[in-house]
């Protein structure tokens, strides 16, 4: 598959697609890094060697009603310099940490939630309700801060009286 299409459709830059699989309503794209890492990010020397790999699956933006799974071969690298203990996997630019979805997929979920419920978005994308809730929670945490309580005095030392009204019958309840 063309690298330009990978970049513009799913935001996968510096990756190449080695093959595609079509299984039912799912397209699986097998990708890997174009260039291997050459220098150690810790010591700066060119003594990195490949130290195995791991295959990870990520949910990508759906195309034409088909579910997209991006299957990436994530390479581990180890530094052979004396005194350097670098042993990590390569950076994954299109996903955060241990998430199983891409940044663009998360943005798509948030856009869907502007017009539908969590349950409807999960059913439309064929993912679990918990994943939709996790994506939405991360979005809310990153874009909104918790309310400030600067004007509220310490409530444990004072007694506050609240009046609760029932406006349907115009009665004071408390």
Language model: regions and residue ranges:
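Residue-level detection of the helix-turn-helix DNA-binding "recognition helix"
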Residues: 45, 126, 137, 141
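Short, Lys/Arg-enriched anionic-surface-contact patches
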Residues: 85-105
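RNase H-like nuclease fold core
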Residues: 133-174
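Short, amphipathic alpha-helical "recognition" segments used to contact nucleic acids or chromatin
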Residues: 101-116
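Short, basic interhelical loop/turn and adjoining N-cap
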Residues: 119-135
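Mobile genetic element proteins and their domesticated derivatives, centered on retroelements
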Residues: 29, 40-43, 79, 109, ...
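Short, structured interface segments
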Residues: 83-91, 130-140
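Short, conserved DNA-binding cores of transcription-related domains
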Residues: 1-86, 91-92
């Amino acid at each position: 598959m063309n690298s330009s299409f990978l970049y513009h459709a799913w935001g996968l830059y510096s990756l190449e697609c080695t093959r595609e699989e079509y299984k039912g309503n799912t397209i699986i794209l097998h990708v890997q890094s174009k260039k291997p890492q050459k220098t150690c990010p810790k010591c700066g020397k060119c003594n990195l060697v490949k130290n195995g790999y791991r295959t990870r699956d990520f949910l990508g933006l759906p195309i034409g009603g088909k579910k997209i799974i991006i299957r990436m071969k994530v390479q581990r690298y180890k530094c052979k310099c004396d005194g350097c203990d670098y042993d990590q996997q390569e950076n994954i630019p299109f996903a955060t940490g241990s998430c199983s979805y891409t940044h663009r997929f998360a943005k798509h979920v948030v856009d869907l939630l502007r017009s539908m419920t969590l349950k409807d978005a999960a059913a439309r994308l064929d993912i679990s309700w918990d994943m939709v809730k996790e994506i939405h929670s991360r979005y809310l945490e990153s874009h909104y801060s918790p309310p400030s309580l600067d004007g509220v005095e310490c409530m444990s030392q004072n007694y506050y009286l609240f009046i609760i009204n029932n406006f349907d019958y115009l009665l004071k309840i408390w």
